Amino acid sequence: MERYKVIREIGDGTCGNVFRAYNTETNEIVAVKKMKRKFFQWEECISLREVKALQKLNHPNIVKLKEVTMENHELFFIFENMECNLYDVIRERQAAFSEEEIRNFMVQILQGLAYMHNNGYFHRDLKPENLLVTDGTVKIADFGLAREVSSSPPYTDYVSTRWYRAPEVLLQSSAYTPAIDMWAVGAILAELFTLSPLFPGGSETDQLYKICAVLGTPDHTVWPEGMNLPRSSSFNFFQIPPRNLWELIPNATLEAIDLIQQLCSWDPRRRPTAEQSLQHPFFNVGNWVPRPLHASHTKTIETRPNPRLELNLWDFGTEPEDNYLDLTLSLKPSFPGTDFSNNVPEHTKEEILLYPGFENPPVQSGFWPLVASDRPMGDVPAMSSWPQAYVVDGQATLPAVGFSGSPFGLSPLQPNLFENRSFATPIRQVNFF
């Protein structure tokens, strides 16, 4: 260790102290973690979970272990240097993060986590302090509590900082899964919006209360297995209805709220994996934005070959209203990726926005009602089954979670949408399937 000169201490944890130092031979700045316990055999050192995990994990969003050395029964880990951690970034923040900034943080966290889980490890101690940041790059650190996914239970019950601890751990489950990491990710995502913890419990019992105060007290219909865990009787003291997350996180979008709700599900089996989370609509940027736009906001879109047109007439009734509901023009692309907005009447075209930079979209169809644009729309019933990002007749619907082809759909788009005349209601915008 003679070649490393300590600059200052930057962290003090349960297992060790962390110092910023530089290599006197190369002048490279590094982070040195000095373990608190004594080691007498080299075999003890290389058998540590943190060493074994970091030897196997090599990813841009996982901190790099450069060297392990032992002197006078003291063990030192030499890591790449990072400027700060996410806790420092949140604490020093004067204004809320933009959604773009939050999305950038979360993509990196989930990418590192997906790699870790796919390579047989789960972290068990995800929290802002263990997410290191340099120039917008985020890396997962501190694998002292990491376990192999294939390892056999029982696991220790005291893992992760309390505020980010999954309920199955609080209830002393001995056979939890990588889903405990996903709970922590949900809590961190919420904190990035509010700059304060979502579940700031003062004790383990208070932590359960704080979770119930947000999610509502679970029962056998919400989390059957959880009701049989050792400490599940604690719920008898907390009979609380769920809160509306829009009230707690007013600056979050519908997609962000939905992702938080799924990640922070009582039942760990309902939480998406890291890979599934990356496919959530919250991360679907550069795609179309389904909301009404004024003509001045309409984007100019590159001209492409004309699409094939089909006129579909469904079973008409005898009343004029039946014809009004059932006559629809269907446009199907002549090839995948067709952009047909240039052939749309101006009053319809102003209702949509396609991002020119979005490449390789799925084959889509658009539907327009063949009725006069000045026909009154106030009496038309709103569709109840659209996903949360859709806007019907200029009004955003409440989230009916799910996008077609996504693992996040409680109810995907109706496959028989046009077999039922009640769903053929004209919509004052273009909808893509």
From Swiss-Prot:
Gene Ontology CC entries for this record: cytoplasm; nucleus
InterPro entries membership: Kinase-like_dom_sf, MAP_kinase, Prot_kinase_dom, Ser/Thr_kinase_AS
BP-aspect Gene Ontology terms: intracellular signal transduction
Induction line: Down-regulated by cytokinin.
UniProt-listed Pfam families: Pkinase
The protein's name: Cyclin-dependent kinase F-3
Positions with a binding annotation for ATP: 10-18, 33
Residue(s) carrying Phosphoserine: 151
Domain Protein kinase stretches: 4-283
Presence of keyword Repressor: no
Organism: Oryza sativa subsp. japonica (Rice)
Listed EC numbers: 2.7.11.22, 2.7.11.23
Enzyme class: transferase
A Gene Ontology molecular function term of the record: protein serine kinase activity
Active site: 125
Keyword Chaperone: no
Family classification: Belongs to the protein kinase superfamily. CMGC Ser/Thr protein kinase family. CDC2/CDKX subfamily.
SUPFAM superfamilies the UniProt entry points to: Protein kinase-like (PK-like)
